[in-house]
Amino acid sequence: MIRNSGRILFNSLKNSNVKLINRNVIINSNIRLFSTSTNNTIKESVEKKAETISNKDNIASPSSKSIDVSDLAGNADYNFVFERIKTCDKENYINSLLISDPIARRVAYAIRAFNIETVANDHSPKSEKISRLRLSFWKDAINNIYNGKVYDQPLTRVLAQVIKEKKLTKTWFIKILNRREKDNQQVQIKDMEELEQYADDIHSSLMLLTLEGLGVKGNHDVEHCASHLGKAIGIMVLIRGTVYHLASRKTYIPVSLTTKYGINVESLYRGDPQIEKLQNAIYEMASCAKLHLDKAKQFRGKIPHPATEAFLSVSVVEDFLERLRKADFNIFEFPNTQQHPLLLIKLYKNKFFKQF
């Protein structure tokens, strides 16, 4: 079997475990609508608009007006974002909690909350339409923030605040949204190169925004490391969510791999696991993630503090790949929710010694 000949690729990984998210596609919940106006007519108009959007549709909604950039986030807004991450993205909640600087930590939480809001719940035709509306809203919201106007809504106020404080680059936000829009189409990823590009567009962009929050910008080694680690994380997330994706009639296994190993995608959707064929495909995806992880680790010793705090996820990816190897790349038997306290200890140790 092809995966047996290449398992030596994973021998350098140490055993540890990580608490993973039960659902790898993060599910959005409704964001409350806020109105700062005391004018009853405007208030009633806003509430009427809010009622037209059902809870099931689940679209983040601005108020009927924008607020000026000078009137930004308060404690309630930050608490909303904090609880959003704590509830929906425990893994990055912990990683962001380990960032020492409180302002940089707020930036990390805002960025991760933004990522949550851009993820589709599922890939049904109705959800596809809702996702398009949601992404359109967030693209307008980001453009407005950079033009000095802010939708009167908790996360947009927080984003406006951190963008103003840290001068975050607009390009990374738009890059994430453009990839989400493309992903919203019912098209299977073509090959490994496109898979890497998907991971880079989303997860490397998130990492670069986090680094800007830490005050690190324009460092070639840091950005190169972020690109490789972002690709490794992105591929890990897609592998980890394979079972959930299949249940939603979606797969991120590239066409080149399903063709190479004779995987019938429609049969996968209908419940035929095709375990051995799928193991081979998952092995190749994991090998690609391992390759980028190793390239990121080559920058150890070259990354200045506090940038190292953005790269603590190296330990998370290492743990995932090692546990996947032990499961023989069988995602149907993979302990996806298993937690081991040693991983958290390792994360704290790396933070303390300013390494990754």
UniProtKB/Swiss-Prot annotation:
- Identify the Pfam families for this entry: SQS_PSY
The cross-references to SUPFAM superfamilies, in alphabetical order and at most eight, read: Terpenoid synthases
Q: For this UniProt entry, what's an example GO CC term? A: mitochondrial inner membrane
Q: Where in the cell is it found?
A: Mitochondrion inner membrane
Q: Which InterPro entries match?
A: Isoprenoid_synthase_dom_sf (IPR008949), Squ/phyt_synthse (IPR002060)
UniProt-listed GO biological process terms = biosynthetic process; mitochondrial respiratory chain complex I assembly
What role is this protein assigned?
A: Involved in the assembly of mitochondrial NADH:ubiquinone oxidoreductase complex (complex I) at early stages.
Protein name stated in the entry: NADH dehydrogenase (ubiquinone) complex I, assembly factor 6 homolog
Organism whose genome encodes this protein: Dictyostelium discoideum
